[in-house]
Amino acid sequence: KVSDSAYSNSCSNSQSQRSGSSKSRLSGSHSSGSSGYGGKPSTQASSSDMIIKRNKDKSRKKKKNKGTGQGAGQAQTLISASTSLEGRDEEKPRPSGTGCVEQQICRELQDQQHGEDHSEPQATEQLQQEEEDQSGSESEADRVEGVAKSEAAQSFPIPSPLSVTIVPPSMGGCGGVGHAAGLDSGLAKFDKTWEAGPGKLESMTGVGAAAAGTGQRGERVKEDSFCCVISMHDGIVLYTTPSITDVLGYPRDMWLGRSFIDFVHLKDRATFASQITTGIPIAESRGSVPKDAKSTFCVMLRRYRGLKSGGFGVIGRPVSYEPFRLGLTFREAPEEARPDNYMVSNGTNMLLVICATPIKSSYKVPDEILSQKSPKFAIRHTATGIISHVDSAAVSALGYLPQDLIGRSIMDFYHHEDLSVMKETYETVMKKGQTAGASFCSKPYRFLIQNGCYVLLETEWTSFVNPWSRKLEFVVGHHRVFQGPKQCNVFEAAPTCKLKISEEAQSRNTRIKEDIVKRLAETVSRPSDTVKQEVSRRCQALASFMETLMDEVSRADLKSGSSGNFTTASNIHMSSVTNTSIAGTGGTGTGTGTGTGTGTGTGTGTGTGTGTGTGTGTGTGTGTGTGTGTGTGNGTNSGTGTGTTSSSRGGSTAIP
């Protein structure tokens, strides 16, 4: 079997060089028998005392060969011959009894009860070889303690998930001389974890990892969240906190070297990818992201199918997922976490820190009556009824993730018996939309949740109307659960059987839904009282302007009336003027003037006339009148008269 892990290759090279294998030194192969990937029995899990002892023997042989005074070629020949003999001795398989191996496997299954798919031949051979290597060398507890110490020696302390500087065993150097014993145990554990190749989540991860996880769970209190560090170069998980065992059931090191998106539900992978692609440009533009700047969203993560929870029927059991709220934080990789062979393109060396918190159902008992202090969540939908936004707080109350609701019609979640109530509610929404910022609370109604039950909601409705087109843009409902569902766990799968409704009821419900959508698409009219107020305000402004204009015209007419023969006056009352004109030595002239206005009044005027000897004369007269109205009027009279001797009569007409 050829190794598919870059980490195991590098570690195998260093181990083979340390052990002095002639095969690996002379051929330059990247795989060796000691790594466990070359088809030979693995010796990584054996005691480190034997390796150190062989190294000392080889060093003495080298010194002895150098001290003999022979040539460099002869010394190299002797060293190669001795190491080749040792390599042949190491490659011989160790004898083992079949009955003893079977007893050890049964005893291990009874004690550990950890791992998933024990039916695979590769996992069985690996367990047999581990039991053979461990017999007479060291106890299980000592080996686990050595693994923990080696991990602690290669790791950095983590005060918080936001300041992660831990380097996994694969990222450190594999050829250190001073840490040979710790590296051997750590590499053995890491190779066992990688032995289950990508995609085989049900395979064994090694007895050491299982024992370490069991010991850690017994010593500490269970946590309800976990964190992991992901490389943004290839999406590989570099580190996970031990609490992942309590939350999802996975051994601590099982995620290392795997892609994080493989554990995300298929329907949520697009959401996860969009959050990543959105967060990377923001982090690069800011240069350094503050610690409190997080991107939060919800996904479903895969739960571990172990033998402890479901017995040996791993393959027959379905894969289960649980909802989690993920907090993303982008950070630059520390210098200690960048080995020489870790090449990053375009100068990017970013790490993604994910803090996952499980989401639990909000209900404890069936048909629970919640208090008024229960948290609110908002759902926004367009005028066509399509949901466009959902708060993450709705997940624990409804069981849906936001991406499960967005793009669906909100009419499908209303109870069929409450559609008439919802029609009245949307009528009120359209009326309240005439006033900007108006809101109201509707009657309680039933809403469908993820497990197939209904909850009773109390909603405060608001809407936004486009001020230019007078069209409804969207409706926002701030919901609060008044009564819980009959089934407390909102994340359970909905029943396959649907509620039976008569065809008449279905047609009626369809008609009501269509009426609601048509009503929301109508133009929102302005209220009549608002129109009246605007007209009254405009009339008052126009009347004030006209009064000012008439006052100016009246003053100009009074000044020009005494010298003119014909005057046009604007007045706001009715007046009647009678003028008498006397011409020459006895001529008389009379004139009448009328004016129209908004008021009534009477006025008197005097007229003067001149006559010639022939008996003709002209006369002009002006008359003013006052009335009970609010204005004053001016009249201008002119008259002409004819006479035989000394008198003339003339008439005058006032033009308003």
UniProtKB/Swiss-Prot annotation:
Renumbered residue ranges of the record's region Disordered: 1-161, 580-656
Recorded consequence of changing residue 653 to A: In strain: Merano 7 and Merano 8
Effect noted on mutating residue 57 to H: In strain: SI-LI2
Post-translational events: Phosphorylated with a circadian rhythmicity, probably by the double-time protein (dbt). Phosphorylation could be implicated in the stability of per monomer and in the formation of heterodimer per-tim.
Alphabetized GO MF terms: transcription cis-regulatory region binding; transcription corepressor binding
Mutagenesis or variant effect for residue 68 to A: In strain: SI-K1, SI-K2, SI-LI1 and SI-LI2
Top-rank taxon: Eukaryota
Listed result of changing residue 77 to A: In strain: SI-K1
Mapped Sequence repeat ranges: 584-585, 587-588, 589-590, 591-592, 593-594, 595-596, 597-598, 599-600, 601-602, 603-604, 605-606, 607-608, 609-610, 611-612, 613-614, 615-616, 617-618, 619-620, 621-622, 623-624, 625-626, 627-628, 629-630, 631-632, 633-634, 635-636, 637-638, 639-640, 641-642, 643-644
Bias (Low complexity): 1-34, 643-656
Chief location of this protein within or outside the cell: nucleus
Effect noted on mutating residue 634 to T: In strain: Merano 7, Merano 8 and Kenscoff
CC per GO annotation: nucleus; perinuclear region of cytoplasm
Subcellular location: Nucleus; Cytoplasm, Perinuclear region
Cited function: Essential for biological clock functions. Determines the period length of circadian and ultradian rhythms; an increase in PER dosage leads to shortened circadian rhythms and a decrease leads to lengthened circadian rhythms. Essential for the circadian rhythmicity of locomotor activity, eclosion behavior, and for the rhythmic component of the male courtship song that originates in the thoracic nervous system. The biological cycle depends on the rhythmic formation and nuclear localization of the TIM-PER complex. Light induces the degradation of TIM, which promotes elimination of PER.
Anything else known: The sequence shown here from 1-559 is that of strains SI-CA1, SI-CA2 and SI-K2. From 560-656 it is from strains Merano 4 and Australia.
Record protein name field: Period circadian protein
Organism: Drosophila simulans
Upper taxonomic lineage: Eukaryota, Metazoa, Ecdysozoa, Arthropoda, Hexapoda
This protein's encoding gene: per
